[in-house]
Each structure stands twice: as C-alpha cells, then as structure tokens.
A protein has these predicted regions:
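Short, glycine-/aromatic-enriched active-site segment of Class I SAM-dependent methyltransferases
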Residues: 201-216
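Rossmann-like AdoMet
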Residues: 1-94, 98-139, 154-155
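Short alpha-helix
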Residues: 216-243
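A short, conserved alpha-helix within the catalytic core of class I
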Residues: 168-181
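Short amphipathic alpha-helix with an adjacent loop that forms part of the alpha/beta core around
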Residues: 146-156
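Conserved beta-strand signature within the Rossmann-like core of class I S-adenosyl-L-methionine
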Residues: 181-197
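Conserved catalytic loop of SAM-dependent methyltransferase domains
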Residues: 235-261
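A conserved beta-strand element that flanks and buttresses the S-adenosyl-L-methionine
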Residues: 160-161
C-alpha cells in the first residue's frame, strides 16, 4: 500500500465516516477501562484531515458524555458478539451500516467469517483504508435491498449487529427488513441499539431539520418491546438490556457520579436499550 495519506474534504461522505472514527479513538483515550479500539488510531494515521474542531470540543461535559454513550454501545455489542462466537466459533459476523467501524474484527474469533455492509460509496472508502483480509467480505449495498442476503454464509451460525443505524430508518423499513431476515436466517441473531420516541426525536433533531422531515413518528423507535417489536416478529425471541448500565455498572475512575446518573436516566426515561432478536429455527 502507498504511504500517501487520504485527503478528507469537508461536507463529504468521507467526512461523515471520519468523525465517528475520531470518536472511537477518543473513547479509547478517556474511557480505557471499558473500551479500546487500537484500529481506529491506526486508520486515522492514514488520513489528511483537520481534526481541530473536534479537538476543541473534547473537554465539553456533554460532548464527553456523548462519547461515553458511544463507548458503552460498542462495548455492549462486542460483548454480544463474543458471547455468540463462544457457542458458534465459526459463525458469520455481519456489521450492518459498518462505516469504518471494526467492531466485528476486534471481537471475532480466528475461524469466523466477517461481513461489512454499507452503501457502495462508503465501502469504496473502507476498502482503501481497511483492506479486507482473507476472512472478510465488504459488501456495497443498501441494507433495504435484501440481495445482500445471498452473500452471507450462515451455515455455522450468524450474528448481525448495528451501531447507531436504525434510528435513521422508517419503522416500515425496519419491519420489512427484520421480517425478511428472520425468514432467511433461522437460528441467527440480531443485536442493535435503540431508544424510545422522545430520545430518538432529540437525537435526530438536527438531521430532521436539515432533511425537511416533519413527522418523526414514522422513524424507528422502541417504547415497548412487545408492542413495537415482538408483535410483528412472532417467530423470534426478543430481549433487551440497558444500553448504559445493562452490561456494566460504570463504577470506574473515568466515569463521574454525574455521568452515572445521566446513564441511569438514559436507560430509564429514554429507554436506551441493546435489543437482541433470536430468529427461531424452522
């Protein structure tokens, strides 16, 4: 590979990938007890981009809490992946809406098959910065175009995961996708983060305004597992844990009591969850 760095322009697809990449590096630095992503740092060394705006914000209290949320999410999903791989050592691990995230690579076993799926323009950038290894397949596809199903080898089990992805999907799109996945991948598992309607409205506030969207209620949220998921996925087992405190108590030196209080509010009032859906075998 060339040592020439990839130049990243503002207001481009590449920039939307670089910002969360910087976030994963930053999470590793300020919350090392719960999250480590050495891959993010290595990828950043290949980039020509002005990170000064992000660096200037990093000591802001709410900015730091936002990255605690990110650290918790990636750690939770990594925990779910490792648990599945323990009982399915040659499983397929599928990162839905991968961007430049390496959660699959960081948590997979040596005998696992890894699939990273995102839009073709995103995969083009990923292939340049993170060339796929022998056990990795990068797929350029809209998640709603289920032709990508045929590229997944689920013969030894499969776990799908998505980090911060489905908030941007319409509820009808999620229903159609999940139903198709349950039918095509019996015995598989899907894990992802979610929140209630109020929280999703807050998270998408800027994006909704920019996109000219007037009815946020059409977008995917989960107020109640039974009413918003299980009712239209009868042949599955749906469960959930708190996003912030369901996998760890955050009683670590880098997390203040105030942040633990905010975490409790997030899991409680905003119903921030990591949802697991097990697709029943036929």
């Amino acid at each position: 590979m060339s040592n020439e760095k990839m130049h990243i322009e503002s207001n481009t697809v590449q920039e939307t990938l670089v910002i969360p990449l910087w976030g994963r590096k930053y999470c590793s630095e300020i919350y090392p007890e719960i999250y480590q992503d050495t891959t993010a740092k290595k990828i950043m060394e290949k980039l020509d981009y002005d990170f000064s705006t992000l660096e200037a914000k990093k000591n802001n209290t709410m900015f730091r809490f936002g990255y605690l949320e990110a650290a918790a999410r990636y750690t939770d999903l990594g925990t779910e992946i490792r648990a599945y791989v323990k009982s399915h050592p040659a499983a397929a691990i599928v990162n839905l809406g991968c961007g430049l995230d390496c959660t699959a690579e960081n948590n997979a076993g040596d005998t696992c098959k890894i699939y990273n799926i995102d839009r073709p323009d995103v995969i083009e950038v990923r292939n340049k910065l993170i060339p796929p290894t022998a056990n990795t397949t990068n797929i350029g596809s809209d998640l709603n175009d289920t032709k990508w199903f045929e590229e997944i080898d689920d013969s030894n089990g499969v776990i799908f995961f998505a980090a911060g992805v489905f908030y941007y999907f319409l509820s009808d799109e999620v229903k159609k996708l999940f139903t198709a996945m349950a039918k095509r991948f019996p015995g598989g598992r899907l894990v992802f983060d979610t929140a209630n309607k109020s929280a999703v409205k807050m998270m998408l506030k800027t994006w909704v305004k920019t996109a000219g969207i007037t009815d946020i209620s059409k977008y995917f949220y989960v107020n109640d597992l039974s009413e918003d998921l299980q009712v239209w996925l009868p042949d599955t087992k749906v469960s959930a844990k708190g996003y912030m405190l369901g996998y760890h108590d955050l009683k670590i030196p880098s997390v203040s009591g105030f942040f633990r209080l905010l975490s409790k509010i997030g899991d409680g009032f905003m119903k921030m969850r990591i949802v697991r859906i097990d697709f029943n075998k036929n």
